[in-house]
Curated annotation (Swiss-Prot):
The active site is at C242 (schiff-base intermediate with substrate). It comes from the Bacteria. Heterohexamer of two alpha, two beta and two gamma subunits. Component of the glycine reductase complex, together with components A and C. PB is substrate specific. It is an enzyme of class 1 (oxidoreductase). In the first step of glycine reductase, the substrate is bound to component PB via a Schiff base intermediate. Then the PB-activated substrate is nucleophilically attacked by the selenol anion of component PA to transform it to a carboxymethylated selenoether and the respective amine. By action of component PC, acetyl phosphate is formed, leaving component PA in its oxidized state. Finally component PA becomes reduced by the thioredoxin system to start a new catalytic cycle of reductive deamination. The modification Pyruvic acid (Cys) is found at C242. Keywords: Oxidoreductase, Pyruvate. Changing C242 to S/T: In vitro processing occurs more slowly than in wild-type. The gene is grdE. This is Glycine reductase complex component B subunits alpha and beta.
């Protein structure tokens, strides 16, 4: 598959009479977009605001972040299985409004969602303080059940992303990047002397609103399978998660997964990047055994020399991570794991809930238990009150202070300890 990704650089977003891109500015017809999103009977009200990097704004709680994209040429459309037919995507041309994002907020399910600060110390921990954001405030009807609530918020974000993406359909991109992965036998024939590597992409599927979707299918119900890396760039994988914000992969991160982008950088030079194995993180032991067995079997079947394995979430999925690592290593395949840590606020506790000697090459996204004080900001979008902040994942009794500042673990900040490296955290040895 060969995909041309055309980046249209967005330097500002403003409301206007029509939705269009002009001279690097995305103009949004607010009422038209609200009308587009208001058809869901589960949503009581829709409003939206525009926020920009450096503004004294706090968004909380955050459900998802979506990048506006549009399929210009090629099979299918963006978000197959949800907003487009279930066609195989990942080839042709896709235009991206780079620098723009849709952020969904409102009364969010379970209040395990995150915080995005557009300025101050918290802004350094979230990549979405650097994007111009259309924030969708979606309030549910009274008495809505949790799963219906999550689905409604998810669809609002996806629809907004698709609507805004259409503004880039007929725009000449500022930059075009080409990504290509050939069928396995062609690829091996082209690079016979290069080591074969793949990416084992673990998806959050613990259930109870910890869900990820692949072509519209709940990933709990899949067995590990192989996909082209470019399929991910067209929205084949998307987030349905209400889970700790620091290390869940928002839909935006799936579409821009840096592991995939970085593996392409040296493809055909230092190694042969043959594809992506997607697998899940179900909670029952039998499911974990099945999925890790299939993942290792597939890695062996492809004749791989090495894999990178990324986790999503923590705790229960640590077992899936170590199972995958151990079983793939046992096949004689080199492994590197990507994770983050819950090592206590002093960093002295065990970082993962599971471990094995096979996991001897590890990249960490940081310690999610580290605490930070977020100063009071001038404007709040969403819900920031004691009954929200004190129970957010990473919060505690007394997190919201009387002066409006918030003391939380960085676990509460969207994308702070990204396990695919979509952040600025690193580790150093002294």
């Amino acid at each position: 598959m060969r995909l041309e990704v055309g980046n249209i650089f967005i330097k500002d977003i403003q409301f206007g009479d029509s939705t269009k891109v002009e001279n690097g500015v995305l103009y949004v017809n607010k009422q038209e977009l609200i009308s587009e999103l208001s058809s869901d009977e589960h949503i009581k009200s829709i409003d939206m605001e525009i926020v920009r990097p450096g503004e004294s704004v706090r968004i909380a709680p955050v459900k998802d972040v979506i990048e506006p994209r549009v399929k210009v040429e090629g099979n299918g459309g963006i978000f197959p299985g949800f907003l487009s037919k279930v066609d195989t995507v990942g080839e042709g041309k896709t235009n991206v409004l780079k620098g723009a994002a849709v952020v969904t907020t409102g009364k969010v399910v379970g209040f395990q969602e995150g915080i995005i600060d557009m300025t101050g110390p918290g802004a350094d921990y979230t990549p979405f303080s650097k994007t111009c954001n259309v924030v969708i405030i979606a309030e549910p009807v009274d008495g809505l059940k949790q799963h219906d609530h999550e689905a409604a918020l998810r669809m609002v974000g996806l629809k907004a992303g698709k609507y805004l993406g259409e503004a880039g359909r007929n725009i000449t991109p500022d930059e075009v990047k080409v990504y290509e992965t050939k069928p396995i036998f062609e690829s091996v024939k082209e690079y016979p002397n290069l080591p074969k590597v793949a990416y084992v992409y673990m998806l959050q599927t613990q259930g109870l609103l910890h869900d990820t979707y692949v072509y519209g299918v709940d990933a709990k119900k899949i067995i590990p399978t192989l996909i082209y890396p470019t399929e991910v760039m067209d929205g084949a994988i998307l987030s349905g998660n209400c889970v700790s914000a620091c290390d869940k992969n928002p839909t935006y991160v799936h579409m821009n997964n840096p592991v995939i982008h970085d593996l392409y950088e040296l493809h055909g030079k230092e190694y042969n990047f043959v594809g992506v194995i997607i697998t899940n993180e179900n909670v029952y032991l039998a499911d974990k055994e099945r999925s890790s067995n299939w993942t290792a079997k597939m890695a062996e079947y492809l004749g791989l020399d090495g894999v990178i394995i990324s986790e999503e979430g923590f705790g229960n999925p640590d077992t899936d991570l170590i199972m995958n690592c151990k079983k793939i290593t046992k096949k004689g395949i080199k492994t590197v794991i990507l994770t983050d840590e819950y090592a206590g606020r002093d960093g002295a506790s065990q970082s993962l809930a599971d471990a094995d000697a096979a996991a001897d090459a590890c990249v960490t996204g940081g310690n999610a238990n580290m605490t930070i004080v977020l100063p009071k900001l001038d404007k709040i979008i969403g819900h920031v009150s004691k009954d929200v902040i004190d129970v957010i994942a990473g919060g505690f009794d007394g997190s919201l202070r009387a002066d409006g500042s918030i003391e939380v673990e960085i676990q509460a900040i969207t994308g702070a300890t990204s396990e695919v490296g979509f952040n600025k955290m690193t580790a150093k040895t002294y």
